[in-house]
Amino acid sequence: MNTDSGGCARKRAAMSVTLTSVKRVQSSPNLLAAGRESHSPDSAWRSYNGRNPETLNGDATYSSLAAKGFRSVRPNLQDKKSPTQSHITINGNSGGAVSPVSYYQRPFSPSAYSLPASLNSSIIMPHGRSLDSAETYSQHAQSLDGTMGSSIPLYRSSEEEKRVTVIKAPHYPGIGPVDESGIPTAIRTTVDRPKDWYKTMFKQIHMVHKPDEDTDMYNTPYTYNAGLYNSPYSAQSHPAAKTQTYRPLSKSHSDNGTDAFKEATSPVPPPHVPPRPRDQSSTEKHDWDPPDRKVDTRKFRSEPRSIFEYEPGKSSILQHERPVSVYQSSIDRSLERPSSSASMAGDFRKRRKSEPAVGPPRGLGDHSSSRTSPGRADLPGSSSTFTTSFISSSPSSPSRAQGGDDSKMCPPLCSYSGLNGSPSSELECCGAYRRHLDVPQDSQRAITFKNGWQMARQNAEIWSSTEEAVSPKIKSRSCDDLLNDDCGSFPDPKTKSESMGSLLCDEGSKESDPMTWTSPYIPEVCGNSRSRLKHRSAHNAPGFLKMYKKMHRINRKDLMNSEVICSVKSRILQYEKEQQHRGLLHGWSQSSTEEVPRDVVPTRISEFEKLIQKSKSMPNLGDEMLSPVTLEPPQNGLCPKRRFSIESLLEEETQVRHPSQGQRSCKSNTLVPIHIEVTSDEQPRTHMEFSDSDQDGVVSDHSDNVHVERSSFCSESDFDHFSFTSSESFYGSSHHHHHHHHHHGHFISSCKGRCPASYTRFTTMLKHERAKHENIDRPRRQDMDPGLSKLAFLVSPVPFRRKKVLTPQKQTEQAKCKASVVEALDSALKDICDQIKAEKRRGSLPDNSILHRLISELLPQIPKRNSSLNALKRSPMHQPFHPLPQDGAIHCPLYQNDCGRMPHSASFPDVDTTSSYHAQDYGSVLSLQDHESPRSYSSTLTDLGRSVSRERRGTPEKEVKLPAKAVYDFKAQTSKELSFKKGDTVYILRKIDQNWYEGEHHGRVGIFPISYVEKLTPPEKAQPARPPPPVQPGEIGEAIAKYNFNADTNVELSLRKGDRIILLKRVDQNWYEGKIPGTNRQGIFPVSYVEVVKRNTKGSEDYPDPPLPHSYSSDRIYSLSSNKPQRPVFSHENIQGGGEPFQALYNYTPRNEDELELRESDVVDVMEKCDDGWFVGTSRRTKFFGTFPGNYVKRL
């Protein structure tokens, strides 16, 4: 029933809310604080005369005062000092909004604060106004068609105050004020100034104001449910102006208060309840007034001031606001977040799927103090108790949602409802753990809450939990975290519980020890034992929660009072200390020389495995494995009921199951674990059933095959598996490094965090074997070949570390093994080198292969050539000879200092600098000739004619192409064969074997039978007519052609290898003149192309041999033999004084034509050492002369 300004009573179908502002400090920085001047009779006059049926129905087109002509005589409200502002509620369709102060409003976009339609029946209106007088004004928010409303601050500028227009606009219900054309004013204004609107909205969304400590101390948001009842004063206080526009001025919802919207499913609104006596005592207070509590809601805003202040899971504000408890419940976390439309709309969507639907609500009481439930006034203590619920569901829940009906507003959370003297004080867990939380009156707070749970700066109590029934949930989920987080910070350690299972404990445990599993903060309920937990399991399995409780139940009192730290070393030390106190060690730790019984170890380890397996598969645990929770301190210092130390568990079970072994099992050495040796005849198997697999209890027979220092490459799953299958398996033992490491891997188990069963099988056995290694000097077991084992580790992908051996005996053995290792490596590398050479000769080994790169990396870095490039050119031009005959018979070729004919001193037959394919061709072609010798191949490469220089520069095929004439037709049968006809000329490239040639015909290359062709003698060039040779004074000797020489001019003489030449005279130091006997061919030819075999006495003084230089640096090699008695023979021994002997360490392949080939262990006589690190010398093996890297040789 609503009453308009005229006093006429009329029925409404739409819901109406009457909001009465009280004396309040404004919490939003954007709203101006109201002063005393704002409460003028004008505002009161306008407030109570602006009610008409049209505005009551949402028709905010014009007011009744305007219709009666009162607009011209309205009071002047342009008080610039402190204009009064308020919040109004506007429907989702931008319906009529009213203001008690301002006649004009700025534009407001309906989409800016639009709310989901699913939350349409709950309206939460926070109000904060600074009013110093006792006068109050009413606001009325109307929702015509069930759409949502949002709080909009009103603002009045000076420009709008000066602008007064009276416009008669058509009436459109529900669209708000319109202009003369019928267009809503908000839409029109938004369209006219889109840029300003967007800029304003962007600033409002992204700006967070710092709270003002002086003005935001006493602002309490409260909640109204507009769909529950009709306000007795539902008339609209202030009519809407025709040119009203809407403009939100708050930076965020949290600045102006909290707008939290929740689903409302109550079908029937409760009847109206008369005001309570305490509310009627005040002249201005009514039953819809907010409670007389001053709560600083700004304290719950956890908006970080800077991104650098953000810490996940923490709130910098709440750190200063929670002086007593360091644990944040889910309610506190939800209150820390600013609410928004999106978070409110998505709160129910983000509810866990496993939670059942919310059950029918209990009528304990309504949420806010604006009203009470139907039967609440009749309950004992209801007049002095009001209910308040807080929202805490998911991280997306709104920040501060107070007020509203419990059936609508109470979220899925576990909270406690305890009415003093009320029969409905039992715990209730309906639906998704939803309960009502009653906040006692101020007079009873000190009695009810004795544990310091009150807020320092708040009078309202904020306490509940997400999944707990009675006590706050600890954040840590492992033993280590409990020790780190809880020491000195929790008021009573014995009341802490681990997880949901321990909180939702069964009936038996509650009856046996109610103080452990119930909250000490609710002594009324716990002392009377009247409440019983009724939990509806999220999982439909009946025994799920019971199993979950058994898996995670931990006695925290013993855990806190214990000195054991969650590390392997600490547990071992604690176990030893406990055993020493009980007198069970018998000099075990004191006497390290005592032998530990061998038969004790497998049994003891089996017991360990049994406990560890049970810890890993906790669902299989029985009731007998659960220790009763006791509050008494542990006796005998062992804490047998602690279930924290594996050693204590083992001690319990061994005393029960193995009384005879209980004494001996303590003899196991508890020193640091290392290696273990268990043979096949002592394979221990546990006497009890394994939960995972029986084979985990078997020790591997190959536990001693690998003796490698442990490394950290094993994953947790591998560690979890191999730690049980092998006591010293390479994977299992690799995870635990040494005993001084206080960190260890987590087990893969059903428990989160570190499980108490973190002491594994192999650590126990390795601990025992460490004692045996220290006490008994066993003979060294014969290992496999150390060289092979070293190679195996080198090529293996498994990382390893060599042990540091300190004993002299082992050092001697290591020294002995070093030679075999080096020998094995050297042999392997030699095989690799040979393989590379063979592959490179076949042309099948790319330069980027791994073997090639390996060899190149192992070889020394070749120094860059600089001064050695000119080392062979610095000698005088007239230093032609350096005879080096070996044994006086076979004379050595020397370099010739001919700059135009640089030799290719490549005597390396395996690798050619240009192409390995061509190097093979050279040898094949030379095999066709009858003059092949051991040096024929190298001689071919060191051919020093002009044509050789040309051919060496890129056309080596010209040298090896030998013409042949086809004597038969040959038709290719395969793609590799070469077809030709009789009479064709075929150029032979190389000889494949005794029956096949490879040749070229008409640009095609292929193979053909040797018998099908006949080699042709290359035609000699036609030499022009020349004058007859002069009369020879006489022959100076005889020589044999070493290489083929093709004449380029008509004065030169072409030579074939092996031709006998009569030397006529010495033209200069580089050229001879001679003739071939039996022919009329005569001409000059290079000295280096022939080998003098006979020298006559007369005629040889024309160009005498120069003396041997001290530092020979000639770049050409000559052959010179002399049988003159007066000339000494330069044998190999004669030149040793001229060079310093060096031995080659590595093979070196020449890269330039003046470089010398080196093979490993070659002896080289070094004549000169260049500044760039290159040496100049002669190889004693090949008798060639050239440069080579100095770091490839060592001094003999």
From Swiss-Prot:
In this UniProt entry, the residues modified to Phosphothreonine are T372, T387
Gene giving rise to this polypeptide: Sorbs2
Localization of this protein: Cytoplasm, Perinuclear region; Apical cell membrane; Cell junction, Focal adhesion; Cell projection, Lamellipodium
On subunit structure and binding partners, the annotation says: Interacts with ABL1/c-Abl, ABL2/v-Abl/Arg, ACTN, CBL and PALLD. Interacts with ABL, CBL, DNM1, DNM2, FLOT1, AFDN, PTK2B/PYK2, SAPAP, SPTAN1, SYNJ1, SYNJ2, VCL/vinculin and WASF. Interacts with PTPN12 and WASF1 via its SH3 domains; this interaction may mediate the partial PTPN12 and WASF1 translocation to focal adhesion sites.
Protein role: Adapter protein that plays a role in the assembling of signaling complexes, being a link between ABL kinases and actin cytoskeleton. Can form complex with ABL1 and CBL, thus promoting ubiquitination and degradation of ABL1. May play a role in the regulation of pancreatic cell adhesion, possibly by acting on WASF1 phosphorylation, enhancing phosphorylation by ABL1, as well as dephosphorylation by PTPN12. Isoform 2 increases water and sodium absorption in the intestine and gall-bladder.
- GO BP terms: acetylcholine receptor signaling pathway; cell growth involved in cardiac muscle cell development; Notch signaling pathway; regulation of skeletal muscle acetylcholine-gated channel clustering
What region holds the SH3 domain? 959-1018, 1034-1095, 1137-1196
User: What's the protein name?
Assistant: Sorbin and SH3 domain-containing protein 2
Q: Which PANTHER family match?
A: SH3 DOMAIN-CONTAINING, SORBIN AND SH3 DOMAIN-CONTAINING PROTEIN 2
